[in-house]
């Protein structure tokens, strides 16, 4: 079980990403636009650097919805491998069954 502070930190990061997503996209569009002047690109890069570090989408880490575990989390289910196996064996995940061949 993850500490509550770690889970709250991830939630805070998700809020920051949502808040600054539009601004980040606009600045990145200016930087990648071939018609932008060097000065415009330079200013956009400076503004992008001044945004909060945690507002970058790559800083957000998927966590298990049950335990808060940060590793081995399946996107489709939002569960870590341990809980996914536990729920699948109990029949709590619809359409999922143990493979046998």
From Swiss-Prot:
Q: Which domain of life is it from?
A: Bacteria
Q: Which cysteines link up through disulfide bonds? A: none
Concerning its family, UniProt says:
Belongs to the universal ribosomal protein uS14 family.
Could you describe the subunit structure of this protein? Answer: Part of the 30S ribosomal subunit. Contacts proteins S3 and S10.
Q: What does this protein do?
A: Binds 16S rRNA, required for the assembly of 30S particles and may also be responsible for determining the conformation of the 16S rRNA at the A site.
Q: What is this protein called?
A: Small ribosomal subunit protein uS14
BP term (GO), one: translation
Query: What are the protein's UniProt keywords?
Result: Ribonucleoprotein, Ribosomal protein, RNA-binding, rRNA-binding
**Which GO-annotated molecular functions does the record name?**
rRNA binding; structural constituent of ribosome
Presence of keyword Transcription: no
Spell out the GO cellular component terms annotated for this protein, sorted alphabetically and separated by semicolons.
cytoplasm; small ribosomal subunit
- Which source organism does the UniProt entry give? Francisella philomiragia subsp. philomiragia (strain ATCC 25017 / CCUG 19701 / FSC 153 / O#319-036)
Which PANTHER family does the entry mention? 30S RIBOSOMAL PROTEIN S14 (PTHR19836), SMALL RIBOSOMAL SUBUNIT PROTEIN US14M (PTHR19836:SF19)
């Amino acid at each position: 079980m993850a500490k509550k502070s770690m889970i709250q930190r991830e939630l805070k990061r998700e809020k920051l990403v949502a808040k600054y997503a539009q601004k980040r996209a606009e600045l990145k569009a200016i930087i990648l636009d071939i018609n932008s002047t060097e000065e415009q690109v330079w200013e956009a890069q400076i503004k992008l650097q001044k945004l909060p570090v945690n507002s970058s989408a790559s800083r957000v880490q998927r966590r298990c919805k049950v335990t808060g575990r940060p590793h081995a989390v399946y996107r489709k289910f939002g569960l870590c491998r341990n809980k996914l196996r536990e729920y699948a064996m109990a029949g709590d995940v619809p359409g999922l069954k143990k493979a046998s061949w």
